[in-house]
Amino acid sequence: MLVFLHAVFITVLILLLIGRLQLLERLLLNHSLNLKTVNNVLGVTDTGLKVNCLQLLKPDCLDFNILHRSLAETRLLKVVLRVIFLVLLGFCCYRLLVTLI
């Protein structure tokens, strides 16, 4: 019974972590969209001037590749956690059936 409660506790923690990762994914998408919007609104042909304007507006996240990479890593981590969640859920159901029979 203790193993079952431990598995349920870990399953709940994984669900909370998946929720936090979804929030992080939304924040990354929002930040990426804001940078692209600022980039399109400026419409400056000189890339040096565009980078300087973007540095004034968003100095901490100019590299779109870093944003897209961290977004992909967040999505991959979310998939891995969902797989772990399903395995633990199956284990919990199995343990519950074994204890009931």
UniProtKB/Swiss-Prot annotation:
Any single Pfam family the record assigns to this protein: Corona_7
Membrane topology: Single-pass membrane protein
Ranges that cross the membrane: 81-101
Signal peptide: 1-23
Keyword tags: Host membrane, Membrane, Signal, Transmembrane, Transmembrane helix
Family of this protein: Belongs to the coronaviruses ns7/ns7a protein family.
Protein name in the entry: Non-structural protein 7a
